């Protein structure tokens, strides 16, 4: 490893932490916890028209199933999501965004994409340096 490799790794981690800090602040400014924002994105991003299961959400967020159940309960109380039984498996609950959840996610996603666009040149430069080192 060269000194430049450590510098590139440190810069990459810095860019990740900077984006995560931005994301947490944006979620809080929208009246959500960062985990609630991530759950909204997971539900929408999993792109199943029937909704996402609690297990899907747990897997996407890298949390335990019972933690995902508690998160879904809190989000349902805030009317960010709706729940219904899976028509194919009555043991499973499917979760979908409500209009309120869709609106919150749309607003947050716009500003996140703007932030990523601003960070893209620095990230691309760092990623290119990693690719160059693997040749």
Placement of each model-derived feature along the sequence:
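Alpha-helical structural segments
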Residues: 14, 18, 60, 110-114, ...
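Pre-recognition alpha-helix immediately N-terminal to the DNA-recognition helix
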Residues: 11, 38-42, 103
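N-terminal leader segment of winged-helix/HTH proteins
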Residues: 1-30, 78-80, 133-135
């Amino acid at each position: 490893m060269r000194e430049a490799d450590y510098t590139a790794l440190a810069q990459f981690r810095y860019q990740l932490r900077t984006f995560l800090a931005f994301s947490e602040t944006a979620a809080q400014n929208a009246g959500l916890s960062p985990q609630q924002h991530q759950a909204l994105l997971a539900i929408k991003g999993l792109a199943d028209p029937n909704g996402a299961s609690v297990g899907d959400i747990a897997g996407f967020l890298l949390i335990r199933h019972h933690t995902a159940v508690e998160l879904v309960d809190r989000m349902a109380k805030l009317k960010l999501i709706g729940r219904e039984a899976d028509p194919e498996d009555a043991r499973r609950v499917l979760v979908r965004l409500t209009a309120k959840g869709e609106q919150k996610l749309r607003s947050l996603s716009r500003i996140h994409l703007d932030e990523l666009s601003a960070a893209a040149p620095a990230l691309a430069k760092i990623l290119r340096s990693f690719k160059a080192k693997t040749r």
